Amino acid sequence: AINYLPKGGFFKLTCQAFEAGLAEESLFRFAMLGVLFYAWRNVKQRLPLALLTSSILFGFAHLINLGGQRADLTFYQIGVAFLLGLFLAVVYVYTGQLWLTMLMHFSLDWFSFLATGTTKLTGDLVPGDWWALLILFVIFGGFSVWMMFGTRRKVMERHVKRLTGEHQHFGYSIQY
């Protein structure tokens, strides 16, 4: 049972997780990637460049947490956010489904917030935390690199064209 949360805490943490999933995915996956894909439409490697750039910006957006948690925890969070942002960006571009990354982001934050009872990182970093970050780097980084080749890359390139309006199909025509 979640009886360690203050009164109204479950609802508040659920709303905060929902806001993060909805707002951050709309901003960094939908808007930011759309702008970067369009801005770099003539750059041959725009796909990996946009994915990395949006993920770096997503990580740095967590600098705002310096106002409510220690610097070392915030910089650790930036690393995790960068890697998660890269994974979510790849999922979004591969599937073309923003709702999926919103759900994934909400779920991750929701379970984390409920498990700790807060939206902030607390405690002290231990060597295991840094090992976990390295493991995330290998998993999410390796997955992202793997997605850049073969049919997976072609699917993402096709979705980029659709997401940026370069390859729209409306399914109708006007005949006179």
Cite the ranges covered by each PLM segment.
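Helix-boundary and loop/linker segments of multi-pass membrane transporters
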Residues: 2-11, 40-45
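Functional transmembrane helices that form membrane-embedded active or gating regions
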Residues: 48, 52-55, 93-107, 163, ...
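Membrane-interface helix/loop boundary segments of multi-pass membrane proteins
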Residues: 23-53, 70, 90-97
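Aromatic-anchored segments of alpha-helical transmembrane domains
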Residues: 1, 55-64, 106-118
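Interfacial helix-loop-helix junctions of multi-pass membrane proteins
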Residues: 10, 63-79
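Residue-level signature of the transmembrane alpha-helical core
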Residues: 14, 18, 22, 52-56, ...
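C-terminal membrane module of polytopic membrane proteins
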Residues: 106-176
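Functionally important transmembrane alpha-helices
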Residues: 73-130
